[in-house]
Amino acid sequence: MAQTVQNVTLSLTLPITCHICLGKVRQPVVCTNNHVFCSICIDLWLKNNSQCPACRVPITPENPCKEIIGGTSESEPMLSHTVRKHLRKTRLELLHREYEDEIDCLQKEVEELKSKNLSLESQIKTILDPLALMQGSQNEDKHPLADNPSKMDPDSVVEWKKKLRTANEIYEKVKDDVDKLKEANKKLKLENGGLLRENLRLKAEVDNRSPQKFGRFTVAALQSKVEQYERETNRLKKALERSDKYIEELESQVAHLKHSEEAKEDVDALCQRAPSADSKGPNGSDELGPPKNQSDSARKQAGSASASHLASPSSSRLADSGSVRQESTSRTEPNCPQNKDRYPKPTEPRLGARETPMDTYLEREWGSKPSDCAPYKEDELYGIPASCTPLSLSCLQLNTPENRENPVIKAGSSKKHANHLRKLVFDDFCDSPNACNNNSSEDDRRENEKKSDCFASSKTGFWDCCSTSYAQSLEFDGSEGNAIANSVGEIPSKLSEKSGSCLSKRLSCIRSLEMNRTRTSSEASMDAAYLDKISELDSMMSESDNSKSPCNNGFKSVEVEGPSKSPQGREFLEEPDKLQEGSKLNLSKPALTADGLESGGEWKPSSFFLLSPADHEMSEDFSLHSTSHSGTSEVKPPNCLFQTEFSQGALLSSSQGLFEDQRFGSSLFKISSEMQSLHSPLQSPWSAAFVPEKRSKNGNQSTKRKIQSSLANASPSKATKS
């Protein structure tokens, strides 16, 4: 039915144009695919082709094109009006039938669907409300009963009542259970919400109480505490270092005061003996022989006691330096017989242990041989002044065994900064004790020759007979040395040539030493350990010297410190030493004339030191002032090699009044500012004994601090102890 409706609808909606002529269709013809053509057009097309022009479907006599009934054609006007009316009527009837059949089919389908819908609704009701179902069933039962009241049975009614009662009970129970379940469900929902909130709270609390979070806080707190403890430890270490330094300074001051007190006591005792010795005059030279021998023996015992604490190479070398002065004194003695008549023999005891030249002179006077002085080499202690601090040996240099014959090391041993203490250099370091014993005689002879050449010139120019100047200037060349020999009168030219050549060699060695001062790290560590051991050894030696030979130790400490805090103590300290040196050297010089003594009435002291070429430029304006009441000064030449600082009043005056005047009124030794600022790299071993008080104290304090700082920085054992 629907198929026919579609066909009818298609027929009513056929196109009205031809596919071939594209005009209004006349006598329409349809192919199998319902393509409309004009009958005339398709006939012409089929003459040449056997396919549909639109879809290429073959058009054969078995499958021809079909004509449409009721289509407009040329023959229509030929039909009558009644015929056309009947044709239209037949077409409408056909269409009406088709539509009616289709309407009937649709109505049947609607009825079937309604019945199915009712059945489904009834099923839903029975499922959702069983009571209504029961009531519905009862109503259905009542209707038949009502219809058939005669057929109702009382037994069935009772049975149905029982069923109804049981059903009601079940319903009530189920209803109560449903209510309880609803309440339980509400409670569970509330509990679930509370548990969810508790769970969230616990999660947040766990996050807040995580060990990592508190661990970070704990680590930060511990780190801050550790840093605080480290800062406190560093502060305490610094405070401990400062306290150690302060304690060391106090100990050094205490030792300094002890030495100064001992020196004052010794100087007072010496000054009490000095006026009595001066009052005897030159005629008492024969009577002073036994006291001199006694003082010499006492000094020898003190020197041997203090020398036992030093190393054997240093003691033998220092004794050799004493023997050098013996030879230099013996060389100049025959040239000055007038000194023996004019000046008495030496009568004053000396402050240091340098008694070898005096003993040599006495032995030569009494007919002794120089060979008798040989045993003194092992017992004598060379009079090098000890430091005022326990670190006097900390300035020693550590020399390698192969450098023991190098003159550079020997020249460097005499170098000394102006405000530093003296330095000792142990020149002899042998690989074995046998080698030291084998080479000892050779080294002694070589050292005697060198030192005699170096120090002989100091004896030659000690005093000058000229009234205008009391100091002599020695040049480095041989010509000026000869001029000095002519002015003095009895100095051989060979001695000055030797001194000039020796000094030039020593100065060149000093320059090479300054260029080779670089050290490796291993040598620096060895030097640090050596300085540490030397400081310990020096403290032991100072204790032993104080216990065994207090007199000698006091003299040596006074000699290093120079003048004490009072100027009178300084003059008394320097006076006997000048008397000793004068008594030792006055026999080797011509006698001073009376004109030389009375020329200006001024005492013009000079210093005894050794100058390097670098220091000649610094000492061009070097001047030595006279005593405080003279007011005049004397300028020394820049090429001065040896200048000896002694007072003529100390050597020539024998009256007690002059000694008292020197004791209380005059300052015999004053050095200008140029002398104080001058730093001579080479000095004589006894030149530091005549340094002024202020310079000595400043030098001792600065040297103490420098030695302590160097030991604290360089010594590993010192660092570990601190």
Swiss-Prot record:
GO BP, one annotated term: positive regulation of mRNA splicing, via spliceosome
Positions in coiled-coil regions: 87-129, 157-267
Keywords carried by this UniProt record: Chromosome, Coiled coil, Metal-binding, Phosphoprotein, Transferase, Ubl conjugation, Ubl conjugation pathway, Zinc, Zinc-finger
Modified residues (Phosphoserine): 210, 522, 549, 557, 564, 566, 715, 717
Region (Disordered): 273-359, 541-585, 691-722
Major localization listed first in the record, in broad terms: nucleus
Composition skew (Polar residues), residue ranges: 323-338, 541-555, 698-722
InterPro entries on file: OBI1, OBI1_RING-HC, Znf_RING, Znf_RING/FYVE/PHD
Compositional bias annotation for Basic and acidic residues: 339-359, 571-581
PANTHER family, alphabetized: ORC UBIQUITIN LIGASE 1, RING FINGER PROTEIN 219
Protein name: ORC ubiquitin ligase 1
Species: Mus musculus (Mouse)
